[in-house]
Amino acid sequence: MKKTVSLILVLMTALFACLSACVAEEAANTGKVQKYGNIGRLSKLNITEDELNDVLKDIMVDSICDKYVFYDTMNDMLMALNRGDIVVLETDQNTVRYIASRNDNIADRPPYMNPNMLVFCMLLREEDAELRDQISACIAGMNEDGTIELMKQTYIEDVIAGEEPDAIEPVAFPGAETIKVAVTGDRPPMDYVSAGGNPLGFNTALITEVAKRLEMNVEMVNVSCAARGIALATGVCDIVFWMEVGDFENWEGADFEDQPENTVVTDPYMSVPLWWAVLKDSPVVNVYRDN
């Protein structure tokens, strides 16, 4: 009897996976794509939720999701995923891998359609173009000497594997200029805050090393994701960590810039694919498009 029950469970699991995996093929034959729900993502500074959905309305016809829903914090978006308000949490691959490593019920997977590449850089006010150039020069030097690769291992790969790095201690330069950097804590392991309230993550380590090389002081300022634009414009912070879509200029119908007005960005220091976090018991986990 036990063997029979086990066999039935195995067959049911295989059938579920098969049916889910066949959705894309069936859609190709019928010309329609089955919709499962909405995609969540963190709020953007340069475009509203409605504007993004309008730009992507033609693309979303071929998506397994209905529309995008913005969230101000990663915690809010995770709760929405677990409640079923959204079926996909969309962000950069490193953050999705981190989320999946800390949540047994969540899987990481590529998007249904071809993933965009996300480019990591820093956003500054337009009048701080000289500082932008100095930071870009530091990024180039850190790429050349291998510092960025070492930081990726320590602050991304090791953290995803379960290790916690030492606290990041900025070097003090008495009398030197202080640059204030916004930390949201919403994109671990790139940008997060420890249980003790200390800013951690790859981005924090990177800007700390940049400040050291420029012989500047650095101050981390906790800012919510949605308030980054206001914080930058009003001088609460001087730098915001920023992600751009790598092929944004090819987006058909995009009539807005991929960054807020009156800002400049540094040269990129990393690029990773856009990625999905989905519940393991969701049919979406096994739905892939044959690109």
Residue spans for each PLM region:
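Positively charged n-region of N-terminal signal peptides that target proteins for export
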Residues: M1-I8
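Bacterial N-terminal signal peptides
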Residues: L9-C18
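Flexible loop/hinge segments at secondary-structure junctions
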Residues: E144, E163-I168, G175-K180, T184-P188, ...
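Sec-dependent signal peptide cleavage junction
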Residues: C18-K32
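Periplasmic-binding protein-like
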Residues: A100-A137, G185, Q259-E261, P268-V278
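Extracytoplasmic small-molecule ligand-binding "clamshell" domains
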Residues: A28-D92, Q134, L150, F173-W251
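Extended ligand-binding regions for polar small-molecule ligands
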Residues: G37, S43-D50, D54, P115-G162, ...
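Short beta-strand-centered segments that line the small-molecule binding cleft or hinge
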Residues: A107-P111, R228-E244, F248-L274
